[in-house]
Amino acid sequence: MIRVKIPATSANMGAGFDTLGMALKLYNEITIEETEGETEIKLLGGELDRNYRNNLTYISIIKVYEFFNKEFKGFKIDMSKTNIPLSRGLGSSAACIVGGIVGANALLNEKMTIKDMLKIAVDIEGHPDNVAPALLGGVIISIKDMENIIYSRINVKSQLKYAVMVPDFKVSTELSRKVLPNEYSREDALFNISRCSMLVSALNNGENEKLRYLFEDKIHQPYRKKLINNIDSIFLKAKEYGSLGEFISGSGSTLIAVLEEADENFILKMKTYLDSLKDGWRIFEVENDNNGAVII
């Protein structure tokens, strides 16, 4: 039996639309073992997945077995230890995919390269901005060029913390893509290119004083804001209470405020404000995970 721990991830980070992603110290665990009988997948709460052939972890495992031309009969997969909120922009799908790939590779006692793991993950997920940090940890820049996945790790100099704010409503990735325009002005494109470029530099050099200007975006967040209740007032409060910057995590509905250091006072103030709103917001503080998916 193999047990894998996979971190949550947050894609985009404001100006880095479909390019930047980071791993967070919030984890799911998946256990995998081969069986002689029918595949059985246990979900959160102990419920069995009756439609397991569409399960992302199962699909990922099969892709690895096919990669190595290995035969199989069935699997016993336990996905019940889940801490990453589903469909909230924190990489729950990426965790399922990466957990399946890393787990199957270990189960077969093989040594698949990072390149091949990423290729399988992106083939399933469609883009690398969540699966890359879920696999590798840290803050990752990634691009897809034809069949190649090219990535680089940002060596974040400061020990930043992140106030993660999660409501009780979901935003589907499909809907969040649908609200985006087909064309952008040159000014908006330059706005994002300049901020994304400087964000990478500021993170790498520990220039926290610049971060206030670098999570702003004109490519996706202005259009997705209407899908998230009270986002403007939440961002204003976070700024008032000392955040270095705020952004939508992935396609939402989770929001993230960046903190220079652990700040219990910020969390308490924001919790008080969030409690005054509807939608059951909860808030917690995390930091970057730098290990990615690991066998435990």
Curated annotation (Swiss-Prot):
- Any one GO cellular component localisation term in the record: cytoplasm
**Gene3D superfamilies listed in its UniProt record:** 3.30.230.10, GHMP kinase, C-terminal domain (3.30.70.890)
Q: What is its EC number?
A: 2.7.1.39
Record: residues binding ATP: 85-95
What is this enzyme's catalytic activity, as reactions?
L-homoserine + ATP = O-phospho-L-homoserine + ADP + H(+)
Q: Where in the cell is it found?
A: Cytoplasm
Could you identify this protein by its name? Homoserine kinase
- Pathway of action: Amino-acid biosynthesis; L-threonine biosynthesis; L-threonine from L-aspartate: step 4/5
Gene Ontology biological process terms in this record: threonine biosynthetic process
- A Gene Ontology molecular function term of the record: ATP binding
- Which InterPro entries does this chain map to? GHMP_kinase_C_dom (IPR013750), GHMP_kinase_C_sf (IPR036554), GHMP_kinase_N_dom (IPR006204), GHMP_knse_ATP-bd_CS (IPR006203), Homoserine_kinase (IPR000870), Ribosomal_Su5_D2-typ_SF (IPR020568), Ribsml_uS5_D2-typ_fold_subgr (IPR014721)
Q: Please verify whether the record's keywords include GTP-binding.
A: no
Q: Which superkingdom does the taxonomy of this entry point to?
A: Bacteria
Q: Which organism is it from?
A: Clostridium acetobutylicum (strain ATCC 824 / DSM 792 / JCM 1419 / IAM 19013 / LMG 5710 / NBRC 13948 / NRRL B-527 / VKM B-1787 / 2291 / W)
